[in-house]
Amino acid sequence: MNNNQIQFGGRTLEILDANAGLSGVKFLPSQLSFVTAGYDHTQFLAPLTPGDISKCTSYVTGADKKAVEVFSKFEAYNKQMKETKLAFMSFCTLIVTNPLEDVQFPKLIPETAEEVYLVKNYQERLKKRRQELQENKEIVKHLNIE
């Protein structure tokens, strides 16, 4: 906890990365390796405090070529107030590191209304992500590395 008795954002991201990685392990064929390539739509929506019981949920929402998108959210349950709030959400991109052109991913079968919505909009997010990657390449050209 930080000096305001709120969980450090870095700790939240550490849990997120581990949990998203577990989703990748469950989704991908066992012979494939992957690394975390990036996060987007990352938002801290409400603080996680000492009185909260937090739960991190992650699941795959799309896959294309060598990339797998994983959605993660933190819910915080306040046991005194008996209330649950959405504390954090993010999309994580995992990249398969095996030397393959395209990976044959398992079929995604969304089960809940939330999963159906997020899986349905994957191609839209992928298009935006590819645009952002091009923009980042341009930014990198102008950065000083010492």
Language model segments and positions:
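Domain-wide signal for the mature, well-folded portions of proteins, strongly enriched
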Residues: 18-20, 47, 54
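General structural concept
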Residues: 36-46, 52
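HotDog/MaoC-like acyl-thioester-processing domains
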Residues: 49-53, 61-146
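Active-site helix/loop of acyl-thioester processing domains in fatty-acid/polyketide metabolism
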Residues: 11-31
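Short histidine-centered beta-strand/loop micro-motifs
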Residues: 3-6, 46-47, 84
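A conserved, well-ordered hydrophobic junction motif at loop->secondary-structure transitions
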Residues: 1-15, 143-146
